[in-house]
From Swiss-Prot:
Catalytic activity: a ribonucleoside 5'-triphosphate + H2O = a ribonucleoside 5'-diphosphate + phosphate + H(+)
Keywords (A to Z) from UniProt: ATP-binding, Hydrolase, Nucleotide-binding
Protein source organism: Thermotoga maritima (strain ATCC 43589 / DSM 3109 / JCM 10099 / NBRC 100826 / MSB8)
Family membership noted in the UniProt record: Belongs to the THEP1 NTPase family.
Key word Hydrolase present: yes
Lineage of origin: Bacteria, Thermotogati, Thermotogota, Thermotogae, Thermotogales
Protein name, entry field: Nucleoside-triphosphatase THEP1
Any GO MF annotation of the entry: ATP binding
NCBIfam families from the UniProt entry: PRK13695.1
């Protein structure tokens, strides 16, 4: 089963992904987390479910790749994030991707591994931006994808809804 979680920035997509990854067995992949200095967001970390960390983007990073005010670190994205997805593809039942967004899509290797996991029989839970990017649209428009939109009203109930759908689907496979 392929599950996409979308919603406006700051609504809680990463929080939901982290809760799901703790509750579900045999999961691999990564999530992103804000980096702050005081009240100011200065970048994003990439953290694998195995605990490996790297820098996805920072405001002061020497990089030719930029999204808004953030300079994207393709090296850590590919060596930590992409590698965690490849490892999860080989070893796990469930693959977590937070997120399929502008920064991550700068990497050809990231796009290739996302296509590979979505074309596989593996269960996938990913967060995805509301975007008009052709790659994002291709993923969203797949027949095997279920999209959940997270908002303030369903923030507390969506966790159980996704768990129920996933467990029901896994039960049908057996």
């Amino acid at each position: 089963m392929k599950i996409l979680i979308t919603g406006r920035p700051g609504v809680g997509k990463t929080t939901l992904i982290k809760k799901l990854s703790r509750l579900l067995q045999n999961a691999g992949g990564f999530y992103t987390e804000e980096m702050r200095e005081g009240e100011k967001r200065i970048g994003f970390k990439i953290i694998t479910l195995d605990g490996e960390e790297g820098i996805l983007a920072r405001t002061d990073l020497p990089s030719p790749y930029r999204v808004g005010k953030y300079y994207v670190n393709l090296k850590d994205l590919e060596e930590i994030g992409v590698r965690s997805l490849e490892r999860a593809f080989q070893e796990k039942d469930l693959i977590i991707v937070d997120e399929i967004g502008k920064m991550e899509l700068l990497s050809r290797k990231f796009r290739e591994v996302v296509e590979k996991i979505f074309d596989s029989e593996k269960d996938v839970i990913a967060t995805i931006k509301k975007s008009s990017d052709p790659f994002v649209e291709k993923i969203k428009n797949r027949n095997d994808v279920v999209i959940f939109e997270l908002n303030e009203k369903n923030r507390n109930s969506l966790l159980n809804e996704i768990l129920s759908v996933l467990k029901f689907n896994r039960g049908e496979k057996q």
